């Protein structure tokens, strides 16, 4: 039996999920836009699973921002899952991608807009209003990160046509495809900051984002392993393809991934220290708070991903190779707290 607790993060990355109620509000939006079907139990379960991520990624924000985080999660999963399902041919998939890019770049909706397009449009307009004219560069970074994610979906899905990739190529593609960058740029939208805009183009900051994105990717691959293998999608899961490429057994493959995660965490910590030293002295307490809000968000993307994975029915199962993802483990933890 494997344990996700083999993965070690700094203690100050721990979090308590945001207690604010917002999931039902976003669900009503999903119904309004036709993303979900009324009174459909499967849709309700799917919604609760994916939108609940927001409270782990943004544990300290207010209701308005938590809803926006929930809308981002709703958009991610409903748009990406449709393209991943294989129901569209290449021509149709490309059309869907181009339409969604136009939603974000041009701020336009077609008359026959899909549910995910409507969700994306609403989030875009909220970000535009929140940024205003003064923070147009923040808004542009958010739009750019969303369009890059949109454009990554088809190429990443095509990788498996040539068999499992090497981990270096996989990580290079997946760090965009995992969707971490839009989360980070949305966090910048959340703070009404007066920080020097050159901070966000710092090579240290960019590298920190890459480190976090790769770690989030590897954690996601671990927890989704059983589901993807059962769905014949293991070719793009390192825990699976390490076993095929390197003739590892499952525990050895897992240990290799844990070592990779620890490498990128340590690289992140070194870059974060260097990044903080490179900053000009803060002019006021608000500037310092804003920088540390952004750093905490990077930390929470990792620790929140693992915490969410241990309790979501999307991946938890009685036969999971990870003890923390078996219902019996979660029930035992609950009983011990009573």
From Swiss-Prot:
It catalyses: (2E,6E)-farnesyl diphosphate = (2S,3R,6S,9S)-(-)-protoillud-7-ene + diphosphate. One of its GO terms (biological process) is terpene biosynthetic process. It comes from the Eukaryota. It is an enzyme of class 4 (lyase). Keywords: Lyase, Metal-binding. One of its GO terms (molecular function) is metal ion binding. A motif (DDxx(x)D/E motif) lies at residues 80-85. Its EC number is 4.2.3.160. A motif (NDxxSxxxD/E motif) lies at residues 220-228. InterPro entries: Isoprenoid_synthase_dom_sf, Terpene_cyclase-like_2. Pfam families: Terpene_syn_C_2 (PF19086). Terpene synthase that converts its substrate farnesyl diphosphate (FPP) into the sesquiterpene protoillud-7-ene. Contains several highly conserved motifs that are important for catalytic activity including the aspartate-rich 'DDxx(x)D/E' motif and the 'NDxxSxxxD/E' motif, both of which are involved in complexing metal ions to coordinate the binding of the isoprenyl diphosphate substrate in the active site. Belongs to the terpene synthase family. This is Terpene synthase 1.
């Amino acid at each position: 039996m494997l344990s996700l607790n083999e993965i070690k993060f700094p203690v100050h990355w721990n979090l308590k999920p945001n207690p604010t109620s917002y999931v039902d509000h976003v669900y009503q939006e999903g119904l309004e836009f036709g993303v979900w079907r009324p009174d459909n139990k499967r849709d309700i379960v799917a919604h609760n699973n994916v939108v609940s991520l927001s409270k782990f990624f943004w544990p300290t924000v207010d209701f308005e921002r938590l809803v926006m985080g929930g809308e981002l999660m709703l958009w991610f999963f409903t748009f990406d899952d449709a393209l991943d399902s294989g129901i569209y041919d290449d021509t149709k998939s490309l059309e869907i991608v181009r339409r969604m890019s136009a939603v974000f770049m041009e701020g336009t909706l077609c008359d026959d807009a899909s549910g995910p397009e409507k969700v994306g449009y609403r989030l875009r307009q909220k970000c535009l209003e929140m940024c205003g004219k003064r923070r147009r560069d923040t808004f542009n970074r958010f739009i750019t990160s969303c369009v890059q994610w949109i454009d990554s979906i088809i190429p990443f899905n095509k990788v498996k046509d040539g068999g499992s990739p090497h981990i270096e190529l996989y990580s290079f593609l997946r760090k965009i495809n995992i969707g971490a960058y839009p989360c980070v740029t949305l966090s910048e939208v959340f703070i009404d900051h007066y920080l020097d805009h050159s901070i966000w183009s710092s090579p240290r900051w960019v590298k920190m984002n890459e480190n976090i994105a790769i770690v989030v990717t590897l954690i996601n691959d671990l927890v989704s392993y059983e589901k993807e293998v059962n769905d014949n999608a293991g070719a793009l899961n390192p825990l699976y393809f390490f076993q095929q490429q390197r003739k590892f057994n499952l525990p050895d493959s897992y240990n290799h991934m844990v070592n990779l995660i620890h490498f990128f965490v340590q690289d992140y910590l070194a870059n974060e220290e260097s990044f903080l030293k490179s900053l000009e002295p803060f002019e006021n307490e608000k500037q310092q708070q804003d920088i540390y809000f952004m750093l905490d968000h990077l930390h929470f993307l990792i620790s929140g991903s693992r915490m969410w994975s241990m309790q979501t029915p999307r991946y938890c199962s009685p036969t999971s190779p990870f003890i923390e993802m078996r219902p019996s483990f979660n029930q035992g933890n609950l009983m011990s707290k009573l």
